[in-house]
Amino acid sequence: MSVSNTVTKVEEFDFEDEALEVLETDAELTSDEELVAVEGASEDVREEFDASAKSLDATQMYLSEIGFSPLLTAEEEVLYARRALRGDEAARKRMIESNLRLVVKISRRYSNRGLALLDLIEEGNLGLIRAVEKFDPERGFRFSTYATWWIRQTIERALMNQTRTIRLPIHVVKELNIYLRTARELSQRLDHEPTPEEIALELDRPVDDVTKMLRLNERISSVDTPIGGDGDKALLDILPDSHNADPEFSTQDDDIRESLLNWLDELNPKQKEVLARRFGLLGYEPSTLEEVGREINLTRERVRQIQVEGLRRLREILVKQGLNMEALFNVEYDN
């Protein structure tokens, strides 16, 4: 899968079409002992080994190729996005190629879920292409924030349709797409991952219905699922102990939380209290809009308005720091 193939494949992609069911074999690197065994094996086994090696070579070649694509500055991003909207093919190609590494980063999060990394990247690239087509630079948000939603949803859609043991009925998939599309639109408008409450308010649907539908987009794996090349370990064996967190990630979380507390001091008291209660800061437990409203004697809608105002103010603070809302809340919302 070359960069040029990625750019031209948009004609084959329609996010609204139902995905075809595809059989896929995930190639894995074999050890020296396995290589010896292959040399004495049947022709079919040797061909399978050669295919695995070629798949790995193709992945490494692709990752090396996209490493030469320079990232765009915020100003360049707006410039090329405007040109792309006017039909400039060169600008469209530059937007895509400059964000291919974002696709790889997101695709790695979905490894070991039934699709090979290269297949995940290919699906994510389709989402990136559609994001370039739909992105509106005049809204003032970075392209990566908007593109992340398209990339994630195309990957998750592929996993949902190609790896589910029980496939969802077509009408359920279409209903789910409505919720996912609304979530993408809200993410561009609000510059953060929308909560079920915000999606429900936008669609005028009960929060419980939104939560249930979004759960259909999650993939559930048994803790006894074998992992690794030899399958000698189960998923349960590598699940992290929440009481013994990785020191590196704990340090990162602490740094983000400390910065967040400092930024909260720049908000007015009401905004600070609402955000603290909503996101579990300053000793509070995370609460819903309704719960926060009951605690501070405000309506759910008023709490939502204060939250939006507070997040908007935080975004302004982050822009001055050269950061974005995703960097602030990835500890709370990262999948």
From Swiss-Prot:
Molecular function terms, GO-annotated: DNA binding; sigma factor activity
Subcellular location(s) of the protein: Cytoplasm
Motif, Interaction with polymerase core subunit RpoC: chain positions: 119-122
Matching PROSITE patterns: SIGMA70_1 (PS00715), SIGMA70_2 (PS00716)
Region (Sigma-70 factor domain-3): 175-250
A GO BP entry: DNA-templated transcription initiation
Keyword terms, alphabetized: Cytoplasm, DNA-binding, Sigma factor, Transcription, Transcription regulation
Record region (Sigma-70 factor domain-2): 95-165
GO CC annotation: cytoplasm
Chain intervals for the UniProt region annotation (Sigma-70 factor domain-1): 57-90
Chief location category: cytoplasm
InterPro entries linked to this entry: RNA_pol_sigma-70_dom (IPR014284), RNA_pol_sigma70 (IPR000943), RNA_pol_sigma70_r1_2 (IPR009042), RNA_pol_sigma70_r2 (IPR007627), RNA_pol_sigma70_r3 (IPR007624), RNA_pol_sigma70_r4 (IPR007630), RNA_pol_sigma_r2 (IPR013325), RNA_pol_sigma_r3/r4-like (IPR013324)
PANTHER family hit by this protein: RNA POLYMERASE SIGMA FACTOR RPO, RNA POLYMERASE SIGMA FACTOR RPOS
Family: Belongs to the sigma-70 factor family. RpoS subfamily.
Protein name: RNA polymerase sigma factor RpoS
Organism: Vibrio cholerae serotype O1 (strain ATCC 39315 / El Tor Inaba N16961)
